[in-house]
Regions:
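Core alpha/beta nucleotide-donor-binding catalytic domains of modification enzymes
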Residues: 1-161, 190
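AMP-forming adenylation/ATP pyrophosphatase catalytic core
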Residues: 3, 15, 46-48, 62, ...
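Short coil/loop linkers at secondary-structure junctions
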Residues: 9, 40, 138, 169, ...
Length: 404
């Protein structure tokens, strides 16, 4: 009914975690129920990789990755007021900060262009139960909710009922407090955004400017950067450790901050935030992704992520028709300069490319394994012409701090 009234397409996604024997039955139930409502339905199996996380956190991560892959503009979730109370209490028991204590917002940006919507946060579980019973709706009880060895379940089944006996309006009071926290958090986020815009005014995270901030704002900006770049939530200890490193690091030294979903590197007074999959498009690092041996450079580039860009001194057309190889630089690679030759690793160092990026830098070598071009930077004069073509991997441009 709402689809016709509001003009949107509704579909349902069941995420199968393969954690419970009943999961297949739940899939059948959801599929049948959606069919009765003429709502398109699909399901997705996910692997729950704990990798240091608790079971609940690992399952949540796998589930949200499935939501992101769905391509839906808005993902509607059924968290209710009691869930909100549990989330707040969990955050408090785990020593969470303001963002954790602010629990679940009704709306939040998710992924690149998606929104998470929780329309039932002001509705209690009892109200939902009464509605389902009155309307004769079928529903499923998850048996794992009875497992009080999980902290959330213990709160739900043991602790919070006692609090509700003492404070009958507990959930409403917590909800009101959470809304105030969310308002205060929104103001802090506005301040953080303004500071971030100033720090990155030159197009990169300026550590020199960052050092002029108060210690509290310095930490806030590190949290903010990790969140903006979708690198996961760092612990307070790791933020404090990296803050100390940045206070004293020399420009030519590289520092690394390991995060749940990637890394942040410091080099030459800049920060570089990288997801775990930042090398995914570097086809030259994976021989299986390379074009066949008979392909010329033009064909290899056409099927990969490297582009040919016009350059004042670039590769000649006849070189593009040959069959050179694109691969990662090695310690033995040497490139011809206008006068003499130079080790490619030295050239990368002179361009102030961060050490973490240098081993992955693409070079083009001829059939004799001689380097004829360094992507984004230089072309051997004996293979070049005025107004030729420079192989460019655009993702790596941000690493060239001192262009040739």
């Amino acid at each position: 009914r709402l689809q016709a009234e509001c003009g949107f397409d509704l579909s349902a996604l069941y995420v199968h975690h393969s954690l419970q024997a009943e999961a297949d039955d739940w899939l059948v139930f959801c599929e049948s129920y959606c069919a009765s409502l003429n709502v398109p339905f699909r399901f997705e199996y996910v692997q729950v990789a704990r990798s240091g996380k608790g079971l609940e956190a690992a399952a949540r991560q796998a589930r949200y990755q499935a939501y992101e892959r769905s391509g839906a503009e808005v993902i509607a979730l059924a968290h209710h007021q009691n869930d909100q109370s549990e989330t707040f209490m969990l955050a408090a028991l785990r020593g969470g900060g303001l963002r954790a204590l602010a629990a679940m917002p009704q709306w939040r940006t998710f992924g690149e262009n998606q929104q998470i919507w929780r329309p039932l946060l002001t509705v209690s579980r009892d109200e939902l139960q009464r509605y389902a019973d009155e309307q004769g709706l079928s529903y499923i009880e998850d048996p794992s909710n009875a497992d009080n060895s999980l902290l959330r379940n213990w709160l739900r089944n043991e602790a919070l009922p006692l609090w509700r006996d003492r404070v009958p309006q507990l959930d409403q009071q917590l909800s009101a407090g959470i809304q105030l926290l969310q308002q205060q958090l929104a103001v802090l986020d506005e301040v953080a955004e303004a500071d971030a815009a100033w720090l990155e005014e030159a197009g990169y995270f300026d550590c020199g400017r960052w050092r002029t901030l108060s210690p509290a704002k310095q930490k806030q900006q590190l949290y903010h950067l990790a969140r903006r770049k979708h690198l996961g939530v760092p612990s307070a200890v790791s933020v404090a450790d990296f803050q100390r490193v940045l206070q004293h690091i020399s420009p030519g030294t590289q520092a690394e901050w390991q995060l749940p979903a990637g890394k942040i590197y410091a080099y030459q007074n800049r920060l570089f935030a990288l997801r775990e999959d930042w090398l995914a498009d570097c086809f030259w690092l994976n021989p299986q992704k390379m074009t066949g041996e008979d392909a010329c450079l033009k064909e290899t580039v056409a099927t990969g992520s490297i582009k040919l860009c016009w350059h004042k001194l670039g590769l000649r057309e006849d070189v593009l028709e040959q069959k050179p190889v694109i691969r990662a630089v090695t310690t033995d690679d040497i490139i011809e300069l206008t006068a003499g030759h130079k080790k490619v690793r030295k050239l990368l160092q002179e361009c102030k490319i961060p050490p973490f990026a240098r081993p992955h830098w693409p070079v083009i070598v001829d059939v004799n394994n001689r380097c004829i071009a360094v992507a984004n930077i230089w072309v051997s004069p004996s293979h070049a012409c005025l107004g030729g073509w420079l192989p460019v991997f655009e993702q790596f441009n941000l690493f060239i701090l001192e262009p040739k």
